[in-house]
Curated annotation (Swiss-Prot):
GO molecular function, one term: zinc ion binding
InterPro entries tied to this protein: HSV_PRIM (IPR033685)
This protein's record includes keyword Metal-binding: yes
Identification of the protein by name: DNA primase
Family to which the UniProt record says this protein belongs: Belongs to the herpesviridae DNA primase family.
Amino acid sequence: MTLVLFATEYDSAHIVANVLSQTPTDHCVFPLLVKHQVSRRVYFCLQTQKCSDSRRVAPVFAVNNETLQLSRYLAARQPIPLSALIASLDEAETQPLYRHLFRTPVLSPEHGGEVREFKHLVYFHHAAVLRHLNQVFLCPTSPSWFISVFGHTEGQVLLTMAYYLFEGQYSTISTVEEYVRSFCTRDLGTIIPTHASMGEFARLLLGSPFRQRVSAFVAYAVARNRRDYTELEQVDTQINAFRERARLPDTVCVHYVYLAYRTALARARLLEYRRVVAYDADAAPEAQCTREPGFLGRRLSTELLDVMQKYFSLDNFLHDYVETHLLRLDESPHSATSPHGLGLAGYGGRIDGTHLAGFFGTSTQLARQLERINTLSESVFSPLERSLSGLLRLCASLRTAQTYTTGTLTRYSQRRYLLPEPALAPLLERPLPVYRVHLPNDQHVFCAVASETWHRSLFPRDLLRHVPDSRFSDEALTETVWLHDDDVASTSPETQFYYTRHEVFNERLPVFNFVADFDLRLRDGVSGLARHTVFELCRGLRRVWMTVWASLFGYTHPDRHPVYFFKSACPPNSVPVDAAGAPFDDDDYLDYRDERDTEEDEDGKEDKNNVPDNGVFQKTTSSVDTSPPYCRCKGKLGLRIITPFPACTVAVHPSVLRAVAQVLNHAVCLDAELHTLLDPISHPESSLDTGIYHHGRSVRLPYMYKMDQDDGYFMHRRLLPLFIVPDAYREHPLGFVRAQLDLRNLLHHHPPHDLPALPLSPPPRVILSVRDKICPSTEANFIETRSLNVTRYRRRGLTEVLAYHLYGGDGATAAAISDTDLQRLVVTRVWPPLLEHLTQHYEPHVSEQFTAPHVLLFQPHGACCVAVKRRDGARTRDFRCLNYTHRNPQETVQVFIDLRTEHSYALWASLWSRCFTKKCHSNAKNVHISIKIRPPDAPVPPATAV
């Protein structure tokens, strides 16, 4: 049969109804597209509003072509009058299309009883016919509708309509338009004016040379559609196959799917694919779209999946994508490049002294003490900041001065002013540890300790009496060590020192032991873990740690290298557990300059769903196993994992520790055996907290408690030891147990004590850097990094933009910007608009800190961050809080300017501060002003505030 798509200049539903009822009018129908097939019947069609099985047109009436002579109108490109359609109407073929509307019999005396003739049925059901036509069909009466939907050129409109409306393919209009562009690579015909009449539009389509190419285009589009489906099916298969065999955490898996499709269907990739499958006029129809099969799938494998296959394989990841730089030092003790010559000294002091000796004070007392030390040593030593940072610098410094006070020429440290007790003088030659002690009612005290009584104050004398020195399992060995328990805190800092102590990280000291805060987020429904599960988890983590250590640093012997595990004690059954979504288990993520700072939230909320798995306890109404679980933690499982770096190896910058933690975070998800254990019970991604490796941050020591924030005086969640004994100590584990009880093996900056002798001791080394080649930033994982590369427009480099602002277009290719140039840029272009907005929108007591007579000093910290200080003679001072007027205001608020770029040469500057009070969220970043600074040659004002 022959199909004719037509349109009208008047309401199509009424015109069709007139044809059906054989009511002649002066209207015409305009044939737009014709699909020929040898037949004496011609079906006139309209586009349907809904598509059933991709059939987008349906007939509204049929005519006898022997009477109509359709070819005569098509050849003359003329509209068809209604009289011709009425005369040739085939009622036998048309009436079934509307029979469902004529179910109610119509009785008419004028027609001798019941009406049966089709035209009379239409007449008496005229409203139903019109309603049916308007509900089922699209009836556009203007060419502009066709142009806006199908394209603006005759080739685009004709070919798109012919394929989309007549061929019944599962393709959208946008897809068909893409097929047309690939088919007609050079010429799409003339542009159709939107003001054309329906007659002009019909004549254009009926006389278009593209009518002769419809059959070729349809064959190409069918082949292209088949090729597209095959390509996408292959992409789906590859993405799903990798997802099923890769051990991806849940959230990473979701992001991976999005990233994979973005990579496979990126704009540049689709443009390449279009060139591959473009229409080839010289090829046979069956050879169209057959070049380079599997193009998208191959590119996806090359650009993403092959990389991920290696990146998500532990051995390949460590071998190919992690880069470690180590500096070998001179072994001669008198050399300038030896550890002694470089000042790479860890903590001194005694852990088993006769008494506790050190400085204890709140942040206010600390500021006064440091001011006193500055006064006493002003002519000899550099001044110290009156804050925790100053105390850390004092306790880390190895500088000494000469004195004759004893009658002989001797050297002394500035720490003598902090701890003047003569008996402590020999202990002050090496750096001292700085701790933070949590007191009741959320008070905090800072401590610099030279001597303490660790074992005598913390452990009972007979602690190891029942610990065997023979082969025992890890589980049994752990159960032989019993510690006394306390739950009520003391207001005395000296007493509380042995219950709620936290080590403060000091970036000026080398790091000997890697202290990991490991918070494993448990799945919903996991309300307890069996003992076997907990210890297998620790053994699996030890295996991962040793694999990473051996790959990154070498000289690691897994059978004897110690890894110390501590688990946060489970909450009692009577205590509700809150904050399941809290990001950290029990480590304090603060910079602590105010004794009112808070600790982190409690562990997770109770879970309500059940996820059955071996070794996992769920909450059920009837449980087969009535024995209590070994671990009752809900929400997450908190572990402290401590291991020394290999012998004679230290890290000297916190960025190294953050990078190592990032590598371990990824490696934990890649160990096959560990993943099998973790997958049913947890979400292992990003379990290690990298935030603790910042200057001034503190982490709770093993064997210490947390303070209960609700009760104020009660302690809970003590970090208890789990002994995972290396194979070399399996026959005699007592030495390993003693090492795990030794404080010197548990601190960031203390050299390990009693480290086992190795068959081959390495030379002294410094870890300069550890870098993930694909994800150099510790703030983003692999998926996030690749997603940004795929989706985000590329920003201009900061150095390029800074040079453009300094030197104009001639300096835009500068390789580097010196600190002096950066200071000049901040003073001349960045600071004036910031100060203007600061004075306009902030209270005078805030803005006057930045105006005369105060002299400001801008100290670059890299190219993107500039610290703002006030000059006070030879010293620098910080500011009072920019947000609030605190009860005890102090000039300890740090102010910075961040610089960042966009796709143009505009420069964004943000003024932000960091206040250390609880009210200001304890050292959180508070952004005050952000401005956009346009290039010097821009015609608009230099800054726009947001």
